[in-house]
């Protein structure tokens, strides 16, 4: 595995770093006998942006899927504000409601509107009511400037607009 880490930090002038928001400790992931990640360690501090750069097949997406609990790591720990995120679905749902990731592929459903795409995950993953999912989707779409497009089909959007819908989701 040839995984290269580059970390850039963005902070307001005079901002002091605090405790890590996310801590990854000795995270390893194997698929059968194939070890994809081996004892990865890093923290995400308040105000930091982490950029992961590596060759194709080096484990970047697998790492992010483990951090977002879309994959279960073989060993190691993921902590959110010091609390380990285990395999209990409620803990995972609470964690996912606070931490999001946008992958290179937006994975928007073309047979659904922008609003329906945003509501789907909160309904299926976080088990929110239709009303709660609607309110949350509208709030997030407003935050990314996509509220005027709630009835649009993803095929009608530019790449940047699709990216913003994926962030809102």
State each model region's role.
Residues 1-28:
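ABC-family P-loop ATPase nucleotide-binding domain
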Residues 19-169:
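ABC family nucleotide-binding domain
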């Amino acid at each position: 595995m040839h995984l290269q880490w580059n970390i850039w930090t963005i902070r307001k002038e005079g901002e002091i770093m605090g405790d890590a928001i996310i801590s990854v400790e000795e995270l390893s992931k194997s698929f059968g006998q194939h070890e994809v990640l081996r004892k990865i360690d890093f923290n995400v501090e308040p105000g930091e942006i982490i950029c992961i750069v590596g060759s194709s097949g080096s484990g970047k997406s697998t790492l992010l899927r483990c951090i977002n609990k879309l994959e279960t790591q073989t060993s190691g720990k993921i902590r959110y504000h010091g609390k380990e995120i285990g395999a209990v679905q409620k803990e995972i749902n609470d964690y996912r409601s606070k931490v999001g990731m946008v992958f290179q592929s937006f994975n928007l459903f073309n047979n659904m509107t922008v609003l329906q795409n945003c509501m789907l995950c909160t309904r299926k993953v976080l088990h929110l009511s239709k009303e709660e999912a609607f309110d949350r989707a509208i709030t997030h779409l407003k935050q990314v400037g996509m509220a005027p497009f709630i009835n649009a089909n993803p095929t009608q959007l530019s790449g940047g607009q699709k990216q913003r819908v994926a962030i809102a989701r």
